[in-house]
């Protein structure tokens, strides 16, 4: 059976990869261990969060499915950091995990050019360093010139609960053992990581009346740019905030010797920013309590996910520690928490397209690349699917820059720096985060979605109208000035805006004050024609215009720098400030330009700047 692209794994990365490829007109096959588990969320019942919300918005702006599915199945919507600047705000939604899975499975099974096979892939067909297809345990051979592996935690997955171990990719599901061994045989650098999840509690056994209530936002902010805000009003459920206490800590600490992560049973490195409860108690012994979030898993509110209590402690300890929390003294555990170890591919083995350097046509995306999180997985899956399809079509790859998208930051970090622990996205990882806001993801990326054919005509028309209105308004604010007449100063005083002393550009008037829609319209009534979405963009762009200009200048300078040629006789070991590792890599690769040097794994922007300075000094004869 012949295909153009084969995707192995039906999780968040595999869904976006297979949908993107198929929607671009490429014949695609998705191989998954259990068809009913397509779109299953292995851990928390939520999408988004700080920086993660940016990724979901970017996936959506490019034509991915995650944002639409979240809006269709969400049971609580919030904007995190709402009181802070727009660059660090993050959208987050609680999802109905059952409905999310059903939605995604239905979309996948009803997409043209996309077939689904419930099988276990056990190897690849590789000839002369080029992938030709996939083999399965049932003896089937599926041929394709592009294969995308999105195996999540299933590669050599090993679950730990106390001293008990079980080979599995997720609780109750087979691990992918043969494929993991096959990848090692290809010479790929394979490592071992660990993650975990918490116990799920029978909701009727929890007393939420003694906990802090955490409601959703009103009105609820949708994720997708394609969702109609005027009609978006889903039923929202509250989450609850509870706390561990000294008794909880005593129970956990007295059982450290039974914890797989302390006994030496677990070898893989766990996520730094999502530690298990036993790790938190061990690392932060001076803290009297830790915050936990009690989150509904479905709209039926039958089970609660205890966010903040990920654990692999034995089941008797899990029950005792859960019942020590106020409001949970009668808690009944439906599913026990566990840790899982799994294989991952060193992401420095990859190109920026997510194609492996050693095997032509083989791509990897998601947790297999060392990341953690549904959102990071979806972003990689989308880009792998897009680039595999573009390669089939003989077109140029789509590589998003660091100044263009958080997706660009994510992939660039992975393929140039690599990772020894599960990688999570943060806004602090982006150098140009004022340009990479959630609210302007469509302005940044929907042009690519349009070119790729991943966005429908109705959305494109709406997007282009929005883009036109924003440009029109900003051009007016940049090109027109106002003088400090008595009448105008009175208007500024009336709305509490900063007064001006000289003839001032409108964009600077807004940039100096805390403007909202009403204040701006009181000064410029003609702006009342813009809807709230457009007005929001106008206000942010105006307020931060000078900072945005500065960041854009830095980006332009970087682009110019990367064009600079490196002299053939340039000696890297004479450059002070470069590590031995970077020197070795540069000497081996012998790049001809700074851009070529930037593509080398481990060569940082700081290293490029140092080399640039030395090139300029050598040209001036100063060294």
Curated annotation (Swiss-Prot):
One term under GO cellular component: cytosol
GO molecular function, one term: flavin adenine dinucleotide binding
Single GO biological process annotation from the record: tRNA methylation
Keywords: Cytoplasm, FAD, Flavoprotein, NAD, tRNA processing
One Pfam family in the UniProt entry: GIDA_C_1st
Entries under InterPro entries matching the protein: FAD/NAD-bd_sf, GIDA_C_N, MnmG, MnmG-rel, MnmG-rel_CS, MnmG_C, MnmG_C_subdom, MnmG_C_subdom_sf
Subcellular location: Cytoplasm
Main location per the UniProt record: cytoplasm
Top-level taxon of the source organism: Bacteria
Function: NAD-binding protein involved in the addition of a carboxymethylaminomethyl (cmnm) group at the wobble position (U34) of certain tRNAs, forming tRNA-cmnm(5)s(2)U34.
Similarity-based family: Belongs to the MnmG family.
Quaternary structure and partners: Homodimer. Heterotetramer of two MnmE and two MnmG subunits.
Protein name (database record): tRNA uridine 5-carboxymethylaminomethyl modification enzyme MnmG
Organism, as annotated: Sulfurovum sp. (strain NBC37-1)
């Amino acid at each position: 059976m012949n295909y153009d692209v084969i995707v192995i794994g039906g999780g968040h990365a595999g869904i976006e990869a297979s949908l993107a490829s198929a929607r671009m007109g490429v014949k695609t096959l998705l191989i998954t261990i259990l068809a009913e588990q397509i779109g299953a969320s292995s851990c928390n019942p939520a999408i988004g969060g700080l920086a993660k919300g940016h990724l979901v918005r970017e996936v959506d702006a490019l034509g991915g499915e995650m944002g639409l599915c979240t809006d269709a199945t969400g049971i609580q919507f919030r904007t995190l950091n709402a009181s802070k600047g727009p660059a660090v705000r993050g959208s987050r939604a609680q999802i109905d995990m059952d409905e999310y899975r059903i939605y995604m499975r239905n979309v996948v099974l009803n997409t043209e050019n996309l077939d689904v096979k419930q099988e276990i892939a056990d190897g690849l067909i590789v000839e002369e360093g080029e992938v030709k297809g996939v083999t399965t345990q049932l003896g089937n051979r599926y041929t394709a010139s592009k294969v995308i592996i999105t195996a999540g935690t299933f590669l050599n997955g090993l679950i730990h609960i106390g001293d008990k171990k079980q080979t599995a990719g997720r609780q109750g599901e087979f691990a992918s053992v043969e494929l993991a061994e096959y990848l090692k045989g290809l010479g790929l650098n394979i490592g071992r990581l660990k993650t975990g999840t918490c116990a799920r509690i029978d909701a009727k056994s929890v007393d939420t009346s003694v906990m802090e209530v955490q409601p959703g936002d009103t009105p609820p902010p949708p994720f997708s740019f394609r969702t109609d805000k005027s009609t978006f009003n889903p039923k929202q459920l509250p989450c609850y905030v509870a706390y561990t206490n000294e008794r909880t800590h005593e129970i956990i600490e007295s059982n450290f010797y039974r914890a797989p992560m302390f006994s030496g049973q677990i070898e893989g490195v766990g996520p730094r920013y999502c530690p298990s409860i036993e790790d938190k108690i061990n690392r932060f012994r001076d803290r009297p309590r830790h915050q936990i979030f009690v989150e509904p898993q479905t709209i039926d509110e039958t089970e609660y996910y205890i966010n903040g209590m990920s654990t692999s402690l034995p089941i008797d300890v899990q029950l005792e520690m859960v019942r020590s929390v106020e409001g949970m003294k009668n808690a009944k555990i439906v599913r026990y928490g566990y840790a899982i170890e799994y294989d991952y591919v060193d992401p420095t083995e990859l190109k920026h397209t997510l194609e492996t350097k050693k095997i032509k046509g083989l791509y990897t995306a998601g947790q297999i690349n060392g990341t953690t999180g549904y959102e990071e997985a979806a972003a990689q899956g989308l880009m792998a699917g897009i680039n595999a399809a573009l390669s089939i079509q003989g077109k140029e790859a789509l590589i998003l820059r660091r100044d263009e998208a958080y997706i660009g930051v994510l992939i660039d970090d992975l393929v140039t720096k690599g990772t020894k622990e599960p990688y999570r996205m943060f806004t602090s990882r982006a150098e140009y985060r004022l340009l990479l806001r959630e609210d302007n993801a469509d302005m940044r990326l929907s042009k690519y979605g349009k070119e790729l054919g991943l966005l429908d005509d109705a959305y494109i028309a709406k997007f282009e109208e929005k883009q036109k209105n924003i440009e029109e308004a900003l051009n007016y604010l940049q090109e027109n000035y106002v003088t400090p007449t008595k009448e105008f100063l009175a208007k500024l005083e009336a709305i509490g805006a900063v007064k001006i002393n000289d003839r001032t550009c409108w964009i600077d008037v807004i940039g100096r004050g805390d403007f909202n829609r009403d204040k701006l319209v009181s000064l410029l009534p003609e702006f009342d024609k813009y809807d709230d979405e457009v007005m929001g963009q106008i206000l942010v762009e105006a307020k931060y215009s000078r900072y945005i200009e500065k960041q854009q200048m830095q980006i332009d300078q970087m682009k110019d720098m990367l064009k600079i040629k490196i002299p053939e006789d340039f000696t890297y070991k004479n450059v002070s400030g470069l590590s031995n590792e970077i020197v070795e890599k540069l000497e081996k690769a012998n790049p001809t330009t700074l851009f070529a040097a930037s593509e080398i794994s481990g060569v940082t922007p700081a290293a490029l700047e140092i080399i640039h300075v030395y090139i300029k000094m050598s040209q001036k004869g100063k060294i």
